[in-house]
């Protein structure tokens, strides 16, 4: 049974992070506080430290629960084309999810990181076709669909380090998914996959940062905002 997450929640490891969006607003380098860029860097470091401390058994359990939660989403179950990332490192795992989506006859597109950090796309068939590409990101062999192919997806599932209750997404800082999500038509679901505890009251955001419309964690899913930029 799907658990709908409360509007904002946080576990104990987030106690050291600012709890309200106002804590991040309009701080500058003039002595009043850290810049948005510095705030993002601090939050990234905290999230990554918490993820690295997660036991392997907990990560494996999270993978199964995350897959189950994603598959309860109507927009995923009815999608003809799903765009989803190939997880690496401490990202919420997608290996199981990719195979399940493929077994349901959905057309599964995965990102191919380019040298300029933009995202091309390719069709996922099996794990065996994956090989490490730019910056160690795994991608399929075969034809590239172009950076605009993500606009054809009925739903886009993206990685994130944290998401605010208003849909603001904290990524790795390269801007890859900001560029990709900017190509997704308004109204299309764009959902971030997270671990429990990573949906926060607010995260620092800048004008170019693209928002997500919902999140899925091992504990369930939550709709945040309607589709749009």
Q: Model-derived features: where do they sit?
A:
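Surface-exposed, charge/polar-rich loops and edge strands
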Residues: 2-38, 42, 49-53, 132, ...
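A short, gly/pro- and small-residue-rich
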Residues: 99-103, 172-183
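A structured binding-face within diverse protein domains that lines the active/interaction site
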Residues: 140, 159-161
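Short glycine-rich anion-binding loops that position phosphate/pyrophosphate groups of nucleotides
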Residues: 88-90, 161-165
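Glycine-rich, N-terminal phosphate-binding loop of Rossmann-like dinucleotide-binding domains
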Residues: 86, 160, 219
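A residue-level signal for conserved active-site and pocket-lining positions in enzyme catalytic cores
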Residues: 47, 84, 108, 157, ...
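N-terminal active-site beta-alpha-beta segment that forms phosphate/nucleotide-binding
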Residues: 2-152
């Amino acid at each position: 049974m799907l658990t709908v997450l409360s509007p904002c929640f946080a576990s104990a490891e987030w106690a050291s992070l600012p709890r309200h969006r106002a804590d991040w607003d309009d701080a500058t380098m003039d002595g009043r506080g850290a810049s948005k860029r510095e705030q993002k860097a601090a939050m990234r470091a905290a999230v990554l430290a918490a993820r690295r401390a997660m036991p392997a058994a907990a990560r494996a359990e999270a993978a199964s629960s995350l897959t189950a939660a994603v598959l309860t989403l109507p927009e995923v179950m009815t999608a003809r084309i799903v765009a989803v990332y190939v997880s690496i490192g401490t990202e919420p795992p997608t290996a199981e999810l990719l195979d399940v989506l493929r077994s349901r006859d959905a057309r599964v597109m995965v990102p191919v990181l380019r040298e300029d950090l933009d995202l091309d796309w390719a069709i996922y068939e099996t794990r065996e076709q994956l090989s490490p590409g730019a910056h160690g990101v795994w991608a399929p062999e075969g034809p590239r669909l172009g950076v605009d192919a993500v606009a054809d997806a009925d739903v886009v599932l993206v990685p994130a380090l944290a998401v605010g209750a208003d849909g603001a997404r904290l990524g790795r800082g390269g801007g890859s998914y900001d560029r990709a999500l900017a190509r997704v038509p308004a109204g299309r679901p764009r959902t971030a996959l997270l671990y429990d505890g990573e949906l926060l009251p607010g995260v620092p955001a800048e004008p170019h940062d693209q928002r997500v419309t919902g999140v899925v964690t091992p504990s369930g899913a939550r709709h945040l905002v309607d589709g749009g930029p």
